Amino acid sequence: MEKKGAITRRDLLKAAAASAVALAAPMLNRGRYRIFASSNKEYSARVIELVGRSTLIDMLGLLTLDFSKQAKWFANPESFTPADLQPFKDSKINVFHIAVGLGGPEAYLEALRFFASWNGFIANHDEYFCRIDSAADLERVKRSGKVGILLGLQNSDHFRRPGDVDFFHGLGQRVSQLTYNSRNLIGNGSTERRDEGISDFGAAIIERMNKVGMAVDVSHCGDRTTLDAFEISKKPVLITHSNCRALVAGHPRCKTDEAIKRVGAAESVFGITGVRMFVKVDEPTTIEHVLDHFDHVRNLIGPEHLGVGSDIDLYGYDAMPPELNRQLRAGYKGSYGFRDKIDVEGLNHPRRMFDLAEGLVRRKYSDSDIEGILGGNFKRVLSQIWSV
């Protein structure tokens, strides 16, 4: 006998059926909700659900651009507090690829310090963070509730010989960009005057990276070096953080349509960045112009080859102290084309994956497309590359 006014089994079944119908109809936004105490912005139920069920991967996302703060984290584990952790949890990003550019005659020693520091940081805070080493780690990181750290470098100057690839793989390195913006023994960077492609030494390094399961990244590489890498590598070559030169005429850090098509042919993934001068040559520059780059790649090779490589921390370059910002700009050639601002509004805060997902909804991407872009596509290709 069911009591009047009580919640009955029939009511529960009806509610469950209604929920199933709602989940089966993702095109229905079903309202908008404010989910961050620090912001009045509201997000659609569809986007909240998409972010909630996706594995979010930022294939160039630093934990901080304040390197003095980072040095304190390394020197004194207690200096990293729950307040420092909270923005990463709020972002819902599950994996941060924290690669930086190390080069020159001290590259090997600097790389040793880099990996020692980050391995120590992760070990000291293993209740919060985990190192991403394998496809299995990518599968379980979201369930674990921890923030995944993917160790990489944006230059391969630290490889003195092919055997060094094995050594640094043992220290946790899973991605290596062949060059930064300048020439090295492997190939040529994007801002060099001439690009003569991959050297014999570089080909040997790529071969060893394929063998041990370390991803080849060509985001900062010159045009010839980029294409050579696709020809030489037996595994997919990544472009973790770049944009489309067809939309930013002549910018050396953006990739040609030919390079983008190589990504598709290799069954790889291209990560779009929101760095302002890589998005548009003049103002205004908005999130809609960033979305144009997603559309361009989608139209050339399909949404299954798209991902995110923001190339910033959670707050962006424009939030850096002015002197640090000035020093950063001074380290690049004029061809970078810096303007007053470096970031794009809407992608310069911890909630940026939500804003990006809302933009992709506006551009009529399907739920499966968006899940792939937010991280599923990089998860797929990294798992393939890391298999040996």
In which residue ranges do the predicted regions lie?
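N-terminal hydrophobic targeting/anchoring segments and the immediately downstream early-domain regions
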Residues: 6-193, 249-388
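Divalent metal-binding pocket/active-site signature
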Residues: 157-159, 167-253
